Design a protein with these regions (language model features):
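Active/binding-pocket-proximal capping segment
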Residues: 183-190
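Short, mixed-charge, low-aromatic patches
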Residues: 3-4, 27-28, 162-167
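Long recognition/docking surfaces used for binding and targeting
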Residues: 3-24
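Conserved S-adenosyl-L-methionine
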Residues: 33-162, 166, 174, 178, ...
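Glycine-rich S-adenosyl-L-methionine
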Residues: 190-196
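Short acidic-aromatic active-site loops that bind/stabilize oxyanions
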Residues: 7, 30-34, 196
Length: 196
């Protein structure tokens, strides 16, 4: 029996493999979700001038492609690791990325789990280089992607107070359930003056 090594696999291949399995495991009909093709994501990301120190948000992040593509080829520049005199390592993100998605039942909640898994794939090389930072990477994944379960309005239900340098997103186009959204917005005095 041959031992196979799955190291040093190209990120594009990993991403494509992830996307292929993702499309197979998620029923668009049941979830009402459509994921932006990677070529479209890359075209939009390439138009953005992303630099260290920036804060980027995707309020409808899905599996996180708009947030993860910008860091793919700049991991060393955007995620530094420092070592103190005792040899302890610390992860120092040079960029802040925040992704939000909504979900009520277990199937819908899988999206945010898949976003974290996608981030794991993108950062797998760094994690391998710095195995002592596993807990810090897990905290980063959980801090980066947030699931909104309190309302069908998602991030509109609890407005985000943070300011961002850049919003990278492809917001969902909702047909079914739009009357429910309108009803929820009408109940909220702060929202109904902006959305009618």
């Amino acid at each position: 029996m041959y031992k196979r090594q799955l190291e040093n696999i190209d990120y594009d291949f990993k991403s494509k493999l992830f996307e292929t399995f993702l499309k197979e495991s998620i029923s668009k009909k049941n979830w009402g979700q459509y994921f932006t093709p990677l070529k479209v994501v890359r075209a939009i990301v390439n138009m953005a001038d992303i630099e260290p120190g920036m804060s980027i948000c995707d309020p409808a992040c899905g599996v996180g492609k708009f947030l993860l593509e910008p860091i793919l080829h700049s991991l060393d520049r955007l995620y530094a690791v420092s070592t103190d005199e005792a040899g302890n390592e610390k992860l120092l993100p040079q960029i802040t990325i925040s992704g939000f998605d909504k979900g009520f039942d277990k199937d819908e909640q899988k999206t945010i789990i898949l976003a974290k898994a996608n981030m794991l794939i993108y950062m797998s090389g760094m994690i391998k280089e710095h195995p002592g930072l596993t807990k810090q990477f897990a905290e980063l994944f959980n801090k980066t992607f947030t699931l909104q379960t309190n309302s069908i309005l998602g991030t509109l239900a609890k407005p985000i107070t943070e300011e961002y340098d850049l919003i990278l997103t492809n917001p969902p186009y909702v047909m079914s359930g739009s009357s429910n959204l309108k009803e929820e917005i009408a109940k909220d005095d702060a929202l109904k003056k902006y959305f009618s």
